[in-house]
A protein has these predicted regions:
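Helix-loop-helix
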Residues: 100-101, 112-135, 205, 210-364
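Soluble non-transmembrane domains of integral membrane proteins
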Residues: 1-247
């Protein structure tokens, strides 16, 4: 019943000529899967992600003209409880509806919990210049709740058992983030949920949510609707899926500046239809926006250059009297209406903007 392979048919894998990007995968040297199951009063009394599931659907692919593909699986009954999982794949969407139905085939009421989790190995996928101190993309878990907002939880924090994130809420989602792509478990309906992050054997990390299913009487069925997103970090689409989901796109500390830059880049691309030209035009617009600052800086530097002989002469004549030298220099600056830092300040103001632009290009 686990999702063990998800291949992005419209995205090529970096460094693999002719190969598609594979997000979920379970094989030698790599583990990245989506799992769900039940937790009962005692171990082994309800189906888990380890329980064998049987495919009930006959359709395996989305037919021409069909908008949705429904794939239904049912677990073997465990302790009189059966878990039926229905995946609904929609054409043109990376968001999959996952309906979880708990059937009580026993003679006594049960009240299990449903868990959904993302499990992957701790291999970091960093993208960015191979230069010390250069920004690198984030790989690891992230949580979101309306109260605590977006919370990154690096693998090393989980190892040290000092990961800080909201442990329970009435809304929110959990994700695994890597460069360009993400996977997310969502429970759209408001309701109590618990969040967890743990280190498993074999350098594996599991992050997920727990939901109460409620009392299920004998012969009754309880349903929990969840969703699984597995795909690229397309910001404009992610924001429509769930609150805060666009935040999985990592802009580092430049977030406030990077967001409007990406918005502008996105709309320029819509006009010209080419990302390369969109980037060129964005840089031209930024240079035009900063033209006044740059002109001011160049004028200030030109004035400082013209004053340089007088300043040098002053330093030579008053080198034994630093205080008077400083006073005379400030007098010259006032008389000539020159700001000694006027050539640097306009440039310094622009630096955060272009760092933010770097993050936009790195993340997009």
């Amino acid at each position: 019943g686990s999702v063990v392979r998800a291949e992005m048919l419209q995205h090529r894998a970096s460094g693999e000529a002719g190969g598609n990007m594979v997000l979920f995968e379970r094989g030698e040297g790599k583990t990245y899967v989506a799992q769900s199951g039940l937790i009962g009063q005692t171990a082994g009394d309800v189906p888990t992600h380890l329980t064998p599931f049987k495919l009930l659907s006959t359709e395996r692919s989305l037919a021409e003209g069909q908008d949705a593909l429904v794939v239904k699986l049912a677990s073997e009954p465990v302790g009189g409880v059966q878990l039926v999982r229905t995946y609904t794949f929609k054409r043109g969407s990376y968001l999959v509806d996952v309906r979880q139905e708990v059937l009580n085939q026993g003679t006594a009421a049960v009240a299990p919990q449903l868990y959904v989790q993302l499990v992957r190995d701790g291999t970091l996928i960093h993208e960015g210049p191979d230069v010390w101190g250069a920004p690198q993309s984030y790989t690891g878990p992230a949580f979101y709740t309306t109260e605590a907002k977006f919370q990154k939880v690096p693998f090393e924090k989980i190892d040290k058992k000092d990961a800080e994130f909201q442990k329970s809420a009435s809304d929110g989602w959990v994700s695994m983030v890597q460069h360009y792509f993400t996977s997310v478990w969502l429970h759209p309906a408001a309701g109590a949920r618990e969040f967890f992050a743990r280190h498993q054997a074999g350098n594996l990390y599991a992050v997920g949510m727990l939901f109460p299913v409620g009392d299920v009487a004998p012969g009754a069925t309880s349903t929990v609707d969840t969703q699984l997103y597995m795909g690229p970090q397309e910001e404009m689409k992610l924001k429509d899926v769930s609150e805060g989901l666009e935040l999985v796109k990592d802009y580092g500390w430049t977030h406030l500046l990077a967001k409007p830059l990406f918005w502008l880049l996105f709309h320029i691309h819509n006009l010209v239809g080419n990302w390369g030209w969109a980037i060129v035009l964005l840089v031209v617009l930024l240079k035009a926006a900063f033209y006044g600052l740059n002109a001011s800086a160049y004028r200030s530097m030109a004035k400082m250059k013209a004053l340089n002989p007088r300043i040098q002469a002053l330093r030579e004549s008053l080198k034994d009297n630093p205080q008077q030298m400083q006073q005379e220099m400030m007098k010259i600056y006032r008389e000539e209406k020159v700001n000694p830092i006027g050539g640097c300040l306009p440039i310094l103001i622009q630096i955060p903007v272009f760092i933010a632009l770097y993050w936009v290009l790195l993340s997009s």
